[in-house]
Design a protein with these regions (language model features):
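Solvent-exposed loop/turn segments connecting transmembrane beta-strands
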Residues: 23-36, 76-78, 105-117, 141-150
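Internal, hydrophobic beta-strand segments that form the core of beta-sheet-rich folds
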Residues: 135-137
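Gram-negative (and chloroplast) outer-membrane scaffold detector with strong preference
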Residues: 40-133, 159-162
Length: 162
């Protein structure tokens, strides 16, 4: 009986204060691609703090050929940012949970400083070994950017840090 109690207590504690590195890639409206690399610190009840670096590319059709060519894809509009997000858990189930994502960032495009406010929903599915798969619906408000609003879907993976 005592062994079962100790095993249960250590299992519960293992989910608290866990850390993960995550990589997510997504498509944003209109003609945008997004990549985020982050460090996530999970606190009690699947609430979490996320420290992230984000890159964004917006492509356009080439003026000379009317198609998307390498120059119109890679050199049209690019931005990056570094930020923090708080993610309170709003739904829990067996091997999955959902979090709101509320954050802020600062960064740059090729010309000016950008500020951002980030809002969204993230749903996580827990796999063996502490790995997680997630999808995220994100809405970003970018201050002084080419796009004022960015919205889209991101898919990613989270790897445990021991």
């Amino acid at each position: 009986m005592a062994v079962a109690l100790i095993a249960t207590a250590s299992t519960i504690k293992a989910q608290t204060n866990s850390n993960r590195i995550s990589v997510g890639v997504g498509a944003l409206y209109e003609r945008g691609l997004d990549m985020t690399i982050s460090y996530e610190h999970e606190t009690k009840y699947h609430n979490a703090w996320e420290y992230f670096a984000n890159g964004y590319i917006k492509w356009d059709e080439c003026q000379s050929c009317g198609h998307i060519c390498p120059d119109s894809f890679w050199r049209n509009y690019r931005s990056y940012g570094f930020g923090i997000a708080y993610k309170p858990c709003v739904t829990r189930g067996r091997n999955h949970h959902g979090n709101l994502r509320i954050g802020a960032s600062g960064g740059s495009d090729t010309k000016d400083f950008l500020g951002g406010a980030h809002f969204g929903y993230e749903h996580n599915y827990t796999l063996r070994g502490g790995w997680k798969l997630y999808w995220q619906v994100k809405s970003d408000i970018m201050i002084k950017g080419e796009d004022l609003f960015r919205t889209g879907i991101v898919l990613g993976v989270k790897l445990p840090v021991k």
